[in-house]
Amino acid sequence: MESNNGEAKIQKVKNWSPVWIFPIVTALIGAWVLFYHYSHQGPEVTLITANAEGIEGGKTTIKSRSVDVGVVESATLADDLTHVEIKARLNSGMEKLLHKDTVFWVVKPQIGREGISGLGTLLSGVYIELQPGAKGSKMDKYDLLDSPPLAPPDAKGIRVILDSKKAGQLSPGDPVLFRGYRVGSVETSTFDTQKRNISYQLFINAPYDRLVTNNVRFWKDSGIAVDLTSAGMRVEMGSLTTLLSGGVSFDVPEGLDLGQPVAPKTAFVLYDDQKSIQDSLYTDHIDYLMFFKDSVRGLQPGAPVEFRGIRLGTVSKVPFFAPNMRQTFNDDYRIPVLIRIEPERLKMQLGENADVVEHLGELLKRGLRGSLKTGNLVTGALYVDLDFYPNTPAITGIREFNGYQIIPTVSGGLAQIQQRLMEALDKINKLPLNPMIEQATSTLSESQRTMKNLQTTLDSMNKILASQSMQQLPTDMQSTLRELNRSMQGFQPGSAAYNKMVADMQRLDQVLRELQPVLKTLNEKSNALVFEAKDKKDPEPKRAKQ
């Protein structure tokens, strides 16, 4: 067997092959696609919200002015399970929308004071609205609001803070009014743990922000105002919005100048009504103590202190108990009440430089006293009335108790009426009622006897009237009248009796005429019937003596 061992040829293997072109190109394209994707991918933000109702990853869009600017990628619970974290991706080039004051909120159907909004989401679904910011740099996390902000961050105007001791007076969205015209809205309502009160943030739109000065006052506007005066009742009603939900009004009180503009976030006090604002202008006061023997039920702090209808001050504390004040409950127990006399109310009458304490002391010496009177019969509210009572015991000076000057008091109002009623009852008890009752009994007995006699008389008269003779009396009277009528007919003109009577009267008249000379003579000379009367001559005229 023949073997043929040839020499092997050794050749160098090529490292590159055209086969690798396809995967390399594919890898380059993939890398370019990835680079293009990430380089053109918009920023990612995290939205914090209490719940993700209606929000779905990959479906819920983010819009700004009705233009799609992003989409929600996922919604997951936070690690502490207290809130929801929503991962959202904005479109490329939308980085300019993100600033510190950028606002996100959920748009969905809502019914509020301004009407119904978000009806379009019934078909398209819930979406997130983005309001671009303008201040600060981009943030990674934002709060997602349940409703749109009442005022945009870039809106022109001013934000102020109202402090109140009562909760629930205002709600976000309530109107802010100036003399009935809406100039802003209530934005937020929070509880301040440091001040221990409720803080409301208000936004006043421009150009009305110039109306907010250091002298303005804010008060709760209920939408309806009832004023009962001696002229009648006056009712004022605001708009339907303020009537249903209320609001807040502000203005410069009467007597103050317009004031100076304030800085943003300036704090003001929220008053209950406009009347309490006028009372708050009197900051200077003098404390006095009053001890009332009457019941103070119905007397509240803030009640007026008046002198014949003119307000002089305010009730401060009811009742007022100092640490070292001790009293024993007995029939002479008196309740202390602290009042404040406000000198600024008396400047018009006393002058700017008058000493109110000295003047009040003089009035107390002249009989000025305090009493409780009813201010409202429906609610039973009381007020302190100051007036002169000359019959009260005189005082030589103002007494003090526990560092407070004392104003003497007298019983007034219902207590005074009760006292007068008791005095009247005492006088009635002191009357000699027994003799009066005996006399009245005797008079009543006499009256009864008189009534019996009168009844007997009436019975007798009834018997007489019922007798036959009394029944015949009208018939007899009619017969007599007929006879009289017939007799009178005989004296009618033309009858014989009438003619005879006329002739007799004529003869009598003739006889009287003939007797007149005789009667005249007898009148001149009574003895003319015995002696002949001489005729007097007529007087002759003579010449007057010269």
From Swiss-Prot:
Gene field: pqiB
Record field: transmembrane: 16-36
NCBIfam families in UniProt: PRK10807.1
Classification via InterPro entries: Mce/MlaD, PqiA-PqiB_transport
Organism: Escherichia coli (strain K12)
Origin: domain of life: Bacteria
Membrane topology: Single-pass membrane protein
The keyword DNA-binding is annotated on this UniProt entry: no
Induction remarks: By paraquat.
Periplasmic face of the membrane: 37-546
Lineage of origin: Bacteria, Pseudomonadati, Pseudomonadota, Gammaproteobacteria, Enterobacterales
MCE/MlaD 2: region residues: 158-217
Family of this protein: Belongs to the PqiB family.
Renumbered residue ranges of the record's region MCE/MlaD 3: 285-389
Cellular compartments annotated: Cell inner membrane
One Gene Ontology cellular component annotation held by this UniProt entry: outer membrane-bounded periplasmic space
Protein name: Intermembrane transport protein PqiB
A single MF term (Gene Ontology): identical protein binding
Subunit text: Homohexamer. May form a complex composed of PqiA, PqiB and PqiC. Interacts with PqiC.
Main localization of the protein described in the UniProt heading: membrane
Record function comment: Forms a tunnel that spans the entire periplasmic space. Could be implicated in lipid transport between the inner membrane and the outer membrane. Binds phospholipids. Required for outer membrane homeostasis. Contributes to membrane integrity.
Domain comment in the entry: Forms a syringe-like architecture with a central channel.
UniProt keyword list: Cell inner membrane, Cell membrane, Coiled coil, Membrane, Repeat, Transmembrane, Transmembrane helix
Region described as MCE/MlaD 1: spans on this chain: 42-133
Biological process according to GO: intermembrane lipid transfer; membrane organization
Outcome of gene disruption: Growth of the pqiAB mutant is inhibited by 1% lauryl sulfobetaine (LSB). The pqiAB mutant is also sensitive to caprylyl sulfobetaine.
Membrane topology, Cytoplasmic segments: 1-15
Coiled coil: 437-464
